[in-house]
């Protein structure tokens, strides 16, 4: 898996202070997407064990209390990303108790395959659905267009 950007302290992409990871790779290619540079799976830089360790360390850093992590992109549930995202989410669950995990995907919840559902079964919130420019609404919280749904899973 590749990623484009990692923010160790973020107050924009989810509730509270959190970490945010923007991964590479998206098959949806939504017109009007604000993150077109993340569409190609080989763009950005490789997601390494060192980066994974950094995220775990940041989530557990007591100097800056973080509520959790936001995983966006690109699409964290892109088939090529799922193995690494699953491993990361499993580590967060095991090593960062009490941290919430939010995932944004262009897929709809009812379209997800078994591998993608392994990730979803471990997260707190899934924001699903493609961005639809004609349904864009800047007043919406945590989503860009009114067709997208915020699923509070746990």
Curated annotation (Swiss-Prot):
Induction and repression of expression:
Induced 2-fold by hydroxyurea.
Q: Where in the cell is it found?
A: Cytoplasm
UniProt keyword Ribonucleoprotein, yes or no: no
Task: Name a GO CC annotation attached to this entry.
Answer: anaerobic ribonucleoside-triphosphate reductase complex
**What is this enzyme's class at the first EC digit?**
oxidoreductase
How changing residue 33 to A affects the protein? Answer: Loss of activity. Decrease in iron and sulfide content
Give the residues the record marks as binding [4Fe-4S] cluster: 26, 30, 33
Major subcellular location class: cytoplasm
GO MF, one annotated term: iron-sulfur cluster binding
InterPro entries linked:
Aldolase_TIM (IPR013785), NrdG (IPR012837), Organic_radical-activating (IPR034457), Radical_activat_CS (IPR001989), rSAM (IPR007197)
Segments crossing the lipid bilayer: none
Q: Which CDD domains does the entry mention?
A: Radical_SAM (cd01335)
What superkingdom does the record give? Bacteria
Gene3D superfamilies recorded: Aldolase class I
State how the cofactor is bound.
Binds 1 [4Fe-4S] cluster. The cluster is coordinated with 3 cysteines and an exchangeable S-adenosyl-L-methionine.
Keywords assigned: 4Fe-4S, Cytoplasm, Iron, Iron-sulfur, Metal-binding, Oxidoreductase, S-adenosyl-L-methionine
Catalysed reaction(s) here are: glycyl-[protein] + reduced [flavodoxin] + S-adenosyl-L-methionine = glycin-2-yl radical-[protein] + semiquinone [flavodoxin] + 5'-deoxyadenosine + L-methionine + H(+)
Q: What is its EC number?
A: 1.97.1.-
Q: Which cofactors does the annotated protein need, by name?
A: [4Fe-4S] cluster
- What is the purpose of this protein? Activation of anaerobic ribonucleoside-triphosphate reductase under anaerobic conditions by generation of an organic free radical, using S-adenosylmethionine and reduced flavodoxin as cosubstrates to produce 5'-deoxy-adenosine.
Task: Indicate the family of this protein.
Answer: Belongs to the organic radical-activating enzymes family.
User: What's the protein called, per UniProt?
Assistant: Anaerobic ribonucleoside-triphosphate reductase-activating protein
What organism is listed for this UniProt entry?
Escherichia coli (strain K12)
């Amino acid at each position: 898996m590749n990623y484009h950007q990692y923010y160790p302290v973020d107050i924009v992409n989810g509730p509270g202070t959190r970490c945010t990871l923007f991964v590479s790779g998206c098959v949806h290619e939504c017109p009007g997407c604000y993150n077109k540079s993340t569409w190609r799976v080989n763009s950005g830089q490789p997601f390494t064990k060192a980066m994974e360790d950094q995220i775990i360390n940041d989530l557990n850093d007591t100097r800056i209390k973080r509520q959790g992590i936001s995983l966006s992109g690109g699409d964290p549930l892109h088939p090529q990303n799922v193995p690494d995202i699953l491993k990361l989410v499993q580590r967060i669950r095991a090593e960062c108790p009490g941290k919430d995990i939010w995932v944004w995907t262009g897929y709809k919840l009812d379209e997800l395959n078994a591998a993608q559902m392994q990730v979803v079964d471990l997260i707190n919130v899934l924001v699903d659905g493609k961005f639809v420019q004609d349904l864009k609404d800047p007043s919406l919280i945590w989503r860009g267009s009114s067709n997208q749904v915020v699923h509070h899973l746990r």
